[in-house]
Amino acid sequence: MKLKIGITCYPSVGGSGVVGTELGKQLAERGHEIHFITSGLPFRLNKVYPNIYFHEVTVNQYSVFQYPPYDLALASKMAEVAQRENLDILHVHYAIPHAICAYLAKQMIGERIKIVTTLHGTDITVLGSDPSLNNLIRFGIEQSDVVTAVSHSLINETHELVKPNKDIQTVYNFIDERVYFKRDMTQLKKEYGISESEKILIHISNFRKVKRVQDVVQAFAKIVTEVDAKLLLVGDGPEFCTILQLVKNLHIEDRVLFLGKQDNVAELLAMSDLMLLLSEKESFGLVLLEAMACGVPCIGTRVGGIPEVIQHGDTGYLCEVGDTTGVADQAIQLLKDEELHRNMGERARESVYEQFRSEKIVSQYETIYYDVLRDDKNGKI
């Protein structure tokens, strides 16, 4: 049975927006009718896709409201689209505001549409720590028909911080193997002025404090004393200027390339030798999957969902938050040992295929959809 599914996510380059959009694209390929209900066109919807429809949430400014009422506009648009298109499911990414908006939409139309909510991290680890929002998050979770989270770690944090009376299933993030794969990037290296002998380290993030980009730079400054290497810093955000100054202070400007925001990073990853993700909080770490699919070993911090992605000593290394010396030592060992690097990169690719391939994860979501729609009495959808 083909389903009609509404998907709401942030249309930006963050992990939740990427996963929500890629999930919709994969479901559409399977013949389901997908309706994106978002404040802007998701950046991964960069062409016309069969079975995919976009409904923009327009937020008007009224003098009676101190701030533009995004939540109300979204709930209204959800109800409108769900009723007109006869949607079976609203799949929302983030407990607040999206699960709350879905609940309001369901109450407005009075129909038996099902709500699936996926927790991604910030909605729990940051917002869940705010006492003024805690009850609201719990309500959004408990009013959803099914709740998933992107890691076991996030489920544990949800129960610890929010304490919902709700079962939560782990459904890992995934990547499209047709986009992220190992390939020869010799020409691209030349275009960036990187020689064949130089190793390439890469970090991709939104440059917020929680990502600890300064640790990436500090570790790299130690690494280049032993290894001829370049560091690609991909992204932008509040800490960008601070990191720029740090690079200057460490006198490694000629070793670091600031590439800014990049919508499509697959080629940059395929060109790289090592990924560094040294966050102090990370519910999953989608960029790790993207790198591993390209045969790139990763070094990550032992926090949140990262240990569920990186198998220490097998597909990469884990370190403690702030241990830049440990990161540097592991990186130097790996980059100097060609056989170790090659074997670890291959095992990283195999791990992605075994645990995080799109076919497997999208099928898990399909099963969730069918189960939640199944009639308890006669077993029919």
Curated annotation (Swiss-Prot):
Annotated positions binding (S)-malate: 16, 94, 122
Summary of subunit composition and partner proteins: Dimer of tetramers.
Primary role: Involved in bacillithiol (BSH) biosynthesis. Catalyzes the first step of the pathway, the formation of N-acetylglucosaminylmalate (GlcNAc-Mal) from UDP-N-acetylglucosamine (UDP-GlcNAc) and L-malate.
Disulfide feature: none
Record protein name field: N-acetyl-alpha-D-glucosaminyl L-malate synthase
Claim: Repeat is one of the keywords in the record: no
Annotated organism of origin: Bacillus anthracis
GO molecular function, a single term: glycosyltransferase activity
Reactions accelerated catalytically: (S)-malate + UDP-N-acetyl-alpha-D-glucosamine = (S)-malyl N-acetyl-alpha-D-glucosaminide + UDP + H(+)
PANTHER family membership: SULFOQUINOVOSYL TRANSFERASE SQD2 (PTHR45947:SF3)
Gene Ontology BP term (one): bacillithiol biosynthetic process
Similarity remark: Belongs to the glycosyltransferase group 1 family. Glycosyltransferase 4 subfamily.
Domain of life where this protein originates: Bacteria
EC number(s) per entry: 2.4.1.-
Effect of loss of the gene: Mutant does not produce bacillithiol.
Gene3D superfamilies assigned to the protein according to its UniProt record, in alphabetical order: Glycogen Phosphorylase B (3.40.50.2000)
Keywords recorded for this protein, A-Z: Glycosyltransferase, Nucleotide-binding, Transferase
Residues binding UDP, per UniProt: 206, 262, 290
